[in-house]
Amino acid sequence: MSRRGTAEEKTAKSDPIYRNRLVNMLVNRILKHGKKSLAYQIIYRAVKKIQQKTETNPLSVLRQAIRGVTPDIAVKARRVGGSTHQVPIEIGSTQGKALAIRWLLGASRKRPGRNMALKLSSELVDAAKGSGDAIRKKEETHRMAEANRAFAHFR
C-alpha cells in the first residue's frame, strides 16, 4: 500500500468576468503556447457573437451546448486473449464535460473561416440547437458503444 497521502481533487476556478467555471475550462482548452490573454479574448468575443446571434443569455447557450455534447458512455480499447475489443464504459460528469469541450473546440477549428471567435460561436449555437460536428461526434460515440454492448462484461 502506498505511504503517500491521496491527492486532493482540484476544483476548476471561475473566470474573472462571468464567474463561470465552464468558461474557464473552455479558456484553458483553447489556450495555445501559454497565451492565456488571447484565449480569453477569443472566448469573450465568441460570447458577444452568441449574444448578437441569439439575443438570449450567452452563458445559457454555452451551458446548453455543453450539456448537449456531453457523452454518457464511451468505448475503450481492451486487449483480451490476443484480440482488442472496444469495451463500452460509463463516463463521469467531469470527464464528460472535458470531452464535450474538446469536441466543441475541435469542431470549431475544422470550420471554414479565419476568425476563431466566429467559428466557436457558430459551433456553440449549432450545438445548443442540436446540430453540428460536435453533436455528430457524440452520437457516433454512442453508436459505437451500443454496437459493442456485447463486450460490456470485460470492464
From Swiss-Prot:
It is found in: Plastid, Chloroplast. One of its GO terms (cellular component) is small ribosomal subunit. InterPro entries: Ribosomal_uS7, Ribosomal_uS7_bac/org-type, Ribosomal_uS7_CS, Ribosomal_uS7_dom, Ribosomal_uS7_dom_sf. GO terms for biological process: translation. PROSITE patterns: RIBOSOMAL_S7 (PS00052). SUPFAM superfamilies: Ribosomal protein S7. GO terms for molecular function: rRNA binding; structural constituent of ribosome. Keywords: Chloroplast, Plastid, Ribonucleoprotein, Ribosomal protein, RNA-binding, rRNA-binding. One of the primary rRNA binding proteins, it binds directly to 16S rRNA where it nucleates assembly of the head domain of the 30S subunit. Part of the 30S ribosomal subunit. Belongs to the universal ribosomal protein uS7 family. This is Small ribosomal subunit protein uS7c. The lineage of its organism: Eukaryota, Viridiplantae, Streptophyta, Embryophyta, Tracheophyta. The gene is rps7.
